[in-house]
A protein has these predicted regions:
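C-terminal lobe/tail of nucleotide-utilizing enzymes
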Residues: 2-28, 178-261
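P-loop/Walker-type NTP enzyme "switch/lid" segment
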Residues: 19-36, 54-122, 129-130, 138
Length: 261
């Protein structure tokens, strides 16, 4: 049986209305199985958003995330775990594909999240590049609903993680039409490789498939996840909060490390 031709338009309209009224931002965060401190990098992003008074939901569909239970298909909101006043967490490994449509898009998953967590200002969708392509592709009908999506790519200062990050950036650019990205790089403050890695990713992605590294931030995996973010990470967050949440209050207690381990 064929699907109604207007289904994509209805879905896109619903997403646009949701964004317009709730000011919710969906931020694709590319998971990387070759990094040992992915949870720390996610924590630092949450801290940076909280410093700007934004409430964050982490939708964790990464390779090491827990699987969503059957209740997620019945009442997704009941599966969201509050970690602090500013951060909530949803284990979502394997969940998005349950919302796939006939065109291969899982954009409906984003709409369901928006309905389940209307109080969230930021939704960090942590997943593999292929999953993010299905959710955020600009080549699918209704792409205008996520036209500002700019993936955050996670990596560390060793070859395997950088190679994986490069492949993910290429996939997002070619399959999803998302060539612009930010990089959050886990590296010690004294690492001599961090700057070179960012520079090489910028030049190689530009040369081979037109990728654009908009900004990057170094995050010390051994640092305190609740410390205020540095200027580099704050810039990456600010890109996603243009026009809102400009104030930066005093340090906030959002310790939630156990959930991201």
């Amino acid at each position: 049986m064929s699907l109604p031709t207007h289904s994509h338009d209805d879905q896109a309209t619903g997403l646009r209305q949701m964004f317009a009224h709730r000011r919710m931002r969906f931020v694709p965060v590319v998971s990387n199985p070759h990094i040992g401190f992915g949870g720390v990098l996610l924590e630092r992003l949450c801290t940076a958003f909280a410093e700007r008074q934004a409430t964050t939901l982490v939708v964790d569909a990464g390779e090491r995330a827990g699987a969503a239970g059957e209740m997620a298909l019945v009442d997704l909101g009941q599966c969201i775990e509050p970690l602090s006043k500013k951060v909530s967490y949803l284990a979502a490994n394997g969940l998005s594909i349950r919302f796939v449509d006939a065109a291969g898009s899982t954009r409906a998953f984003l709409q369901r999240i928006g309905e389940a967590a209307p109080e969230s200002d930021i939704v960090l969708v942590h997943a593999s590049a292929s999953e993010l392509c299905r959710m955020f592709s600009q080549k699918n009908p209704g792409a205008a609903a996520s036209e500002s999506a700019c993936p955050i790519v996670l990596a560390e200062d060793h070859p395997a993680s950088v190679t994986h990050a490069y492949a993910a950036i290429k996939l997002l650019a070619q399959r999803a039409g998302l060539p612009v990205f930010d990089l959050v790089l886990g590296a010690a403050p004294q690492s001599p490789r961090a700057g070179r890695i960012a520079s090489q990713l910028a030049s190689c992605t530009d040369l081979y498939f037109g990728g654009v590294l908009r900004d990057w931030a170094r995050v010390d995996p051994a640092g305190d996840a609740t410390e205020p973010p540095g200027a580099e990470l704050d810039r990456i967050v600010a890109h996603r909060l243009v026009g809102d949440f400009t104030a930066r209050p005093a340090r906030l207690d959002i310790a939630a490390s156990a959930a991201f381990s």
